[in-house]
């Protein structure tokens, strides 16, 4: 049974049926993962600083809680009339006001794509047609402009991607899970066979992210 992800129930309940038009001025959500090998925060910092000072766009910056404290402090110091540094616990709260997201390889970008709004990524580890992925800093501003124009082919890819990873958009995933549990118990279900530890997979993932804390 396909249930969906309960975490997204409230999120889907708040989404409008139609994608709202781009705001004036547009609102850009910038988010970066904490892994030093995957994060583009330091690389794109000068561009975020420069673009936030032009006044053409509004920026909301939020960084992973485990991000290097010095990097967090640098971005927080950028706050001005056009840039807000947000420390909300749940990044989903920022999605509705944003017209697009800029990121790198953060898991949050897949969730943002479920709003059917564009994402610009820098050196994404798994780029695809649903993203505008760049590898040069000088392409950052042009990529944002392209995303804000919402080209039809990109928007179609975003919609296809969203339908593939979470086709159920009614905000009732938790209800389906509870129904599935009740049905499983009613049919005399027993605990499934324990999954293997997958220690090698976990080791490779931690090594790739250079993350060894428990």
Predicted segments, located by residue:
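Conserved catalytic-core segment of nucleotide-activated headgroup transferases in glycan assembly
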Residues: 2-74, 134, 169-175
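Nucleotide-activated donor-binding/catalytic signature segment of Leloir-type glycosyltransferases, i.e.
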Residues: 72-87
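Short, structured coil segments at secondary-structure junctions
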Residues: 55, 78-81, 112-116
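C-terminal amphipathic helix plus adjacent low-complexity
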Residues: 142, 148-214
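A donor-sugar binding/catalytic signature common to diverse glycosyltransferases
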Residues: 88-131
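A short acidic, often aromatic-flanked loop/helix-cap motif at beta-alpha or helix-coil junctions
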Residues: 6-11, 91-94, 139-143
């Amino acid at each position: 049974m396909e249930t969906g992800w309960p975490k997204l129930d409230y999120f889907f309940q708040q989404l409008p049926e139609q994608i709202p038009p781009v705001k004036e001025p547009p609102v850009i959500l910038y988010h970066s993962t904490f892994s030093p090998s995957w994060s583009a925060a330091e690389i794109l910092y000068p561009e975020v600083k420069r673009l936030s000072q032009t006044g053409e766009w509004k920026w909301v910056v939020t960084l992973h809680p485990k991000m290097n404290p010095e990097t967090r402090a640098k971005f927080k110091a950028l706050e001005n009339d056009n840039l807000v540094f947000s420390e909300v616990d749940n990044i989903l709260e920022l999605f509705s006001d944003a017209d697009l997201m800029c990121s790198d390889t953060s898991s949050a970008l897949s969730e943002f794509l479920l709003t059917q709004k564009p994402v610009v990524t820098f050196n994404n580890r798994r780029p695809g047609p649903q993203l505008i992925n760049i590898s040069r800093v000088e392409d950052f501003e042009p990529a944002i402009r392209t995303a804000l124009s919402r080209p039809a082919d990109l928007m179609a890819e975003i919609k296809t991607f969203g339908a593939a990873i979470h086709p159920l958009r009614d905000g009732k995933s938790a209800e389906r899970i509870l129904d599935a549990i009740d049905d499983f118990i009613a049919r005399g279900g027993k605990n499934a066979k324990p999954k293997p530890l997958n220690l090698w997979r976990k080791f490779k993932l931690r090594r790739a992210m250079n993350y060894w804390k428990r």
